Amino acid sequence: MYEIKQPFHSGYLQVSEIHQIYWEESGNPDGVPVIFLHGGPGAGASPECRGFFNPDVFRIVIIDQRGCGRSHPYACAEDNTTWDLVADIEKVREMLGIGKWLVFGGSWGSTLSLAYAQTHPERVKGLVLRGIFLCRPSETAWLNEAGGVSRIYPEQWQKFVAPIAENRRNRLIEAYHGLLFHQDEEVCLSAAKAWADWESYLIRFEPEGVDEDAYASLAIARLENHYFVNGGWLQGDKAILNNIGKIRHIPTVIVQGRYDLCTPMQSAWELSKAFPEAELRVVQAGHCAFDPPLADALVQAVEDILPRLL
């Protein structure tokens, strides 16, 4: 990965009556524009995310999506849908005077990248995607319902289901929704910590749990749950695989960890079958973008796609 340079431009953009989103630019002000779309939903971006891009070559734009990271209000699910986020990306592009850009996203960021590209294909130079997640019921059930990845970490699964009454464990995502949006803040925070702790075990091969406090877990837990309960607003004619025809001309590289427990390779495989023009690169790695095999593969993907953007 590249040296992490400080932003040369940053601020907040009012995108609705409620929401302000954080944005920043780093790298070369005259370089090839790229936007980094973080995962979650609700994870927020970190300075390390700049490191996937050569700062001498790229004008690196990073945003924190509604309700998370440095954006305000924190952990707010109101006026917070996939299509709100797509509109926000366009507002940032217009504000910065960028015509077209490379779009880079992993996990939920891959979902949002695809949704944005299918809505505004004329604004996308290329796509670099990692850990494909299409926000389908089968994928959210794999993560947060019994019988999926729960079979890999049964001991941690018991901790995840512990806050839920036994008679409600057949629909865990819905049951957690009631806790994460409960009027009692202590109930919300306890549920958020359990949700985020569970996910942390799926991201790395040697997980250590979530080391931040419960409040720091609230955005990712609440917003993930909010999006999962609503199917990501990507059903029917909005489903990503039903709209591949809109983006088949866009240069695309998919980087997928073979042993990814959060976003298993099945989704990347299905996307590559529907989108044969995209290049699928399978890495002997898990989910975390910063683990060396994946990080190296992502840096290489960006370098390889660059000539097709110029």
From Swiss-Prot:
Belongs to the peptidase S33 family. Keywords: Aminopeptidase, Cytoplasm, Hydrolase, Protease. Gene3D superfamilies: alpha/beta hydrolase (3.40.50.1820). Its EC number is 3.4.11.5. Coiled coil: none annotated. Residues 33-290 form the AB hydrolase-1 domain. It catalyses: Release of N-terminal proline from a peptide. This is Proline iminopeptidase. The active site is at S107 (nucleophile), D260, H287 (proton donor). One of its GO terms (molecular function) is aminopeptidase activity. One of its GO terms (biological process) is proteolysis. GO terms for cellular component: cytoplasm. It is found in: Cytoplasm. It holds the Pfam family Abhydrolase_1.
